[in-house]
């Protein structure tokens, strides 16, 4: 697979089912995802032929499994799913990357509202450090999430081989 741009919905489809289940579980617990959760409820309701109100009565695990089985989602929903996954399950990797960049963070979350764009040499070193320490698909998913969230700050990641998902 080339390192051409990957949209969030495509990345979601490429994620293994077990990771999609983890992402969906984190997503349902994410208090900042109300808009995307409404979209997810409608998708699940259509898929299992339930009323949306009935979907909300399903347990978290069932909703997560149903959502993980939906491969055709919007970019907005897919991006939130991937971000929720990282916030819940990938904090050590996020922190390691920010440490390598010398960016202040709290458990993998950048403290500064407007982070400074890292210079090329620092970014190169941090990318290599992370790629050597974590599985390639995990690093690629994280870098794509950074690019979607803040392309101005993380634009230096574009075109790198570490973005390749396969």
Give the predicted meaning of each segment.
Residues 2-33:
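Charged, amphipathic alpha-helical stretches
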Residues 155-162:
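Acidic, proline/glycine-rich low-complexity IDRs
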């Amino acid at each position: 697979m080339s390192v051409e741009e990957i949209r969030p919905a495509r990345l979601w489809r490429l994620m293994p089912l077990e990771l999609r289940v983890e992402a969906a579980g984190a997503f349902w617990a994410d208090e900042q995802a109300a808009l995307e959760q409404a979209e997810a409820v409608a998708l699940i309701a259509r898929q299992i032929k339930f009323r949306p109100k009935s979907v909300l009565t399903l347990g978290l695990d069932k909703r997560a499994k149903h959502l993980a089985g939906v491969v055709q989602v919007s970019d907005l929903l897919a991006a939130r799913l991937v971000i929720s996954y990282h916030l819940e399950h990938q904090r050590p990797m996020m922190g390691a990357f920010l440490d390598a960049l010398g960016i202040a963070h709290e458990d993998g979350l950048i403290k500064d509202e407007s982070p400074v764009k890292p210079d090329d040499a620092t970014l190169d070193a941090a990318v290599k450090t992370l790629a050597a320490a974590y599985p390639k698909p995990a690093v690629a998913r994280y870098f794509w999430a950074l690019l979607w969230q803040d392309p101005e700050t993380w634009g230096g990641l574009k075109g790198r081989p570490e973005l390749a998902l396969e």
